[in-house]
Amino acid sequence: MEDRVEISMLMDLYSSLLTEKQRSVMALYYDDDLSLAEIAELNKTSRQAIHDLIKRCDKQLLSYESKLNLLQKSMRKEKYIMNFLEELKEKYSVSDKDYLMFKEKLENL
């Protein structure tokens, strides 16, 4: 998985475990696609300090995932749901409307 995408997904799961400043910087970098220099200017700090904070947060998020495996479980669940829905559609001739209804209900589990 591409690092940037993986970190963004980990942020969705674990951002509440970061400090407010860490969340803010990570959101600016990964969600808003600001450069290190732009984030440093907004935070009145050095580019190097922002770089270090992001790298530290990346490691922290990866550490949370290695211990809790929430992203892995979520991806496995998503794959299972998609396979189940495809099987349902093929074997039981489920209409597109019903397919979408089942999909929505399963995703909300």
Swiss-Prot record:
Taxonomic lineage: Bacteria, Bacillati, Bacillota, Clostridia, Eubacteriales
Function of the molecule: Might take part in the signal recognition particle (SRP) pathway. This is inferred from the conservation of its genetic proximity to ftsY/ffh. May be a regulatory protein.
Family assignment from sequence similarity: Belongs to the UPF0122 family.
Gene3D superfamilies with a match to the protein in the record: Winged helix-like DNA-binding domain superfamily/Winged helix DNA-binding domain (1.10.10.10)
InterPro entries hit by this protein: RNA_pol_sigma_r3/r4-like, UPF0122, UPF0122_fam_protein, WH-like_DNA-bd_sf
HAMAP family for the chain: UPF0122 (MF_00245)
SUPFAM superfamilies: Sigma3 and sigma4 domains of RNA polymerase sigma factors
Pfam entry (one): UPF0122
Superkingdom, natural source: Bacteria
NCBIfam families, per the entry: PRK00118.2-2, YlxM
Protein name listed in UniProt: UPF0122 protein CLH_1195
